[in-house]
From Swiss-Prot:
One GO process term, biological-process aspect: translation
Keywords: Cytoplasm, Ribosome biogenesis
GO cellular component annotations of the record: cytosol
Pfam families reported in the protein's UniProt record: DUF150_C (PF17384), RimP_N (PF02576)
Primary location: cytoplasm
Family of the protein in this entry: Belongs to the RimP family.
Protein role: Required for maturation of 30S ribosomal subunits.
Location of this chain's protein in the cell: Cytoplasm
Protein name: Ribosome maturation factor RimP
Length: 162
């Protein structure tokens, strides 16, 4: 069984989603996980790390160190389910081939539409002449990531009051 398939099968059984697997130098294996309803906390990473360590031992997976982490605020988007889940949020999208001389776009994700196998994802962005809508398929996508939203205003009234 392929490593990614092995990890994905294990995570699915545990109620998690595999976001990405990275093999780094010196035998480091990084696994990024998510959970649609609650997100991921450190205890989730510990639980997954312990389970994967056992699975890798049984399956004779060669690695030196295992890191399990959440995908972060700038989570990669790879599947139709990702684009459906994060519709309405801002993302940076890079296409394989340019559209009107442009490959990189930042805008609001529109949920995928179309027949199965022909789904198109929408991205509402600010074009040269105002708001525009980009439509693309997963096969046209090079990479996409959420744009982190950091709201420090919520902490303004906390702490020392003068």
């Amino acid at each position: 069984m392929h490593l990614t398939d092995l990890i994905e099968k294990t995570l699915t059984a545990m109620g998690y989603e595999l976001v990405e697997v990275e093999r780094a130098p010196a035998g480091l294996l990084r696994v990024y996980i998510d959970q649609a309803e609650n997100g991921v906390v450190i205890e989730d990473c510990e639980k997954v790390s312990h389970q994967l360590t056992r699975v890798f031992e049984v399956e004779n997976v060669n690695y030196e160190r295992l890191e399990v982490s959440s995908p972060g605020l700038d989570r990669p988007l790879r599947t139709l389910a990702d684009f459906t889940r994060f519709a309405g949020l801002e993302a940076k999208v890079t296409l394989r081939l340019p559209v009107d001389g442009q490959k990189n776009f930042t805008g609001i994700i529109q949920a995928p539409t179309g027949e199965p196998g022909q789904e198109r994802i929408g991205l509402e962005f600010e074009g040269k002449e105002g708001p525009a809508l980009l439509g693309f398929t997963l096969s046209e996508l090079d990479r996409a990531r959420l744009v982190p939203v950091l709201d420090f205003k919520g902490n303004r009234n906390k702490g020392n009051k003068q």
